[in-house]
Amino acid sequence: MNKVLVSALRYSQGPDATAGLATEMVGLGLRGPVCIIASRSAQKELESTWTTVFAAAGMAFVIHPFSGECSRNEIARGRAAAAACGAQVIVGAGGGKALDTGRAVAAELGIPAVCCPTIASTDAPCSAISAVYSDEGLFETYLFHPHNPSLVLVDSTVIARAPVRLLVAGMGDALSTWFEARACMRSGARNSRNGVSTGAGMAIAELCWRILQADGVSALDAMKTPTATPSPALERIIEANTLLSGIGFESAGLAAAHAIHNGLTVAPEVHAFHHGEKVAFGTLAQLMLEEAPQEEITAVLNFCTSVGLPVTFAEIGLHDPSGVSRLHE
């Protein structure tokens, strides 16, 4: 079985990075027309910048508003919009589900994808995977695409203005990366490319956990007292949530933490919680299933409580024991 490292073609992160979007795309040989699948908040925040940078590069673009759910119906709507404008590249802008939709549309059309996350709430931006849900928000399946994004462009100034809870959710998603990678390594499970992780993939996954421990609380403090330039700690957490976790989970694999997340989506009570919040809970459950050393469980528990991630059923909305029972069915 081959060792496989999986990553985006190019990753670019920094303050006001959106100003360089068209330049980065041209440098990769990407040309218009461009179809931007954008969440409402991303469009509100970035449309004026897109207009400026694409005009300067002589690239036509259209914006397709994202409905809020990465469903088969939404992917079909996005594909129709992209085909109608003759798009040669898809840009997904917004949160994880908008980016998942953008990658799915690009894969169906056989054209490159660019991801521009406006929040650091998941490790979705760098991946070649789309999590598909029903229109009502129930998890259905994963789509595995032939190619990772050609470009992931992360504007840390935009992310620093996002709600703090979304960064915390991203840390919850990133938290699982090392522990799921380790579980896959121990069991010999295959990664998303039908191989096993390289040493580099495992090292990146472990580094993700170390950065969360070192910088998580400081990054939250920085978001609560914003400055003109995002702090070094916040930049490191954005990178951990987005790049390190993205490479780690695709290169090393997923385990119980994400499976538990998927099961939780059947309970309506948890729909108000973000992906990473549920994954963090699943990570603790995975460590219990593995009978991990108590000091490791305590370290993860302490991290979760220090940044505000849920650690009990009640904290993910399951106050009624009957709701917990449904998860076994």
Residue ranges and their predicted role:
Residues P15-D16, A38-R40, A93-G95, C116-I119, ...:
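Fold-independent oxyanion-binding glycine-rich loops
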Residues E108-A200:
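A glycine/threonine-rich phosphate-anchoring loop and its flanking beta-alpha core
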Residues T18-L21, Q43-E47, R72, K97-A104, ...:
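Short glycine/serine/threonine-rich phosphate/pyrophosphate-binding segments
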Residues A82-V105, L109-T118:
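A short, small-residue-rich loop immediately preceding and capping a beta-strand
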Residues G20, A292-E329:
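C-terminal charged capping/lid subdomain of soluble metabolic enzymes
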Residues S192-F303:
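Active-site segments that bind and position negatively charged phosphate/pyrophosphate groups
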Residues M1-V89, F313:
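ATP/NTP phosphate-donor binding region
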